[in-house]
Amino acid sequence: MKYIKRFENSLESIITTINYSNSRFYKLPKLPKTLISLDCVGNNLISLPKLPDGLENLYCSGNDLTSLPNLPDSLKKLTCNFNSITKLPKFPITLIELHFAGNGIIKFPDLPEGLEHLDCSSNKISHITKLPNSLKKLYCYKNNLTELPILPYTLEYLYCNHNNLEKLPKLPGALEYLICSNNELTSLPELPDGIQLLDCRNNNLIELPDLPDSLKKLTCDGNNLPYDDLDGYKYFKKYPEKYAAKKFNL
């Protein structure tokens, strides 16, 4: 069994960052009180030691964790992708970035109001509760979702592909990237003026909404769209060669 021994007393008072990534450790020692950032990605850990009160960044993806210890009130970034976690602890209000993709999460957790980046993809979530008003990036693909909640007006990235969605809520004006492929969508809501990328392939769409001039890439194959008459779409009529032929996957 590979593990690391406790730090010397002379080091405990000065260490702020530790990187144990891809070291095949089964166990970690007691962590220094001064620690701000811990990276233990890609080991064989089944548990973590008590986390220091001042810890701000925790990266523990790719282990065998089934749970996490209590999180310190100072934590800003948490990445625990691809473990075997089924229940998450309470999150501190300081948390800005949260990644727990590829676990066994069924119940969507309560989120801190200041959260800006959330990746909950590849879990077993069937319902998402209220999202923080500060959220900018949401990755919730490969779950069991049938609907989405009201989206915060700050949201810029939405990846909700590979679910069972039949419709989407109103899209926020800040949205730039919308990936909603491989669902059961029959229509799309009005697209925001600043959207740059739309991937809506493999749904049940029979028409597209008006496509804003800001759009740079559209992928919409695998639907029931009438491609025989692209002039029916104002966007393609306005940019018949520059976009339809070169940047759009039809």
Protein language model features and the residues they cover:
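N-terminal segments that cap or nucleate solenoid repeat domains
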Residues: R6-N43
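Short acidic, low-complexity intrinsically disordered linear motifs used
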Residues: M1-E12, E241-L250
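Asp/Glu-rich intrinsically disordered low-complexity tracts
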Residues: K33, D39, N44, D53, ...
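Conserved hydrophobic beta-strand positions in leucine-rich repeat
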Residues: I18, L38-C40, L58-C60, L78-C80, ...
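Canonical leucine-rich repeat
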Residues: L28-L31, L48-L51, L68-L71, L88-F91, ...
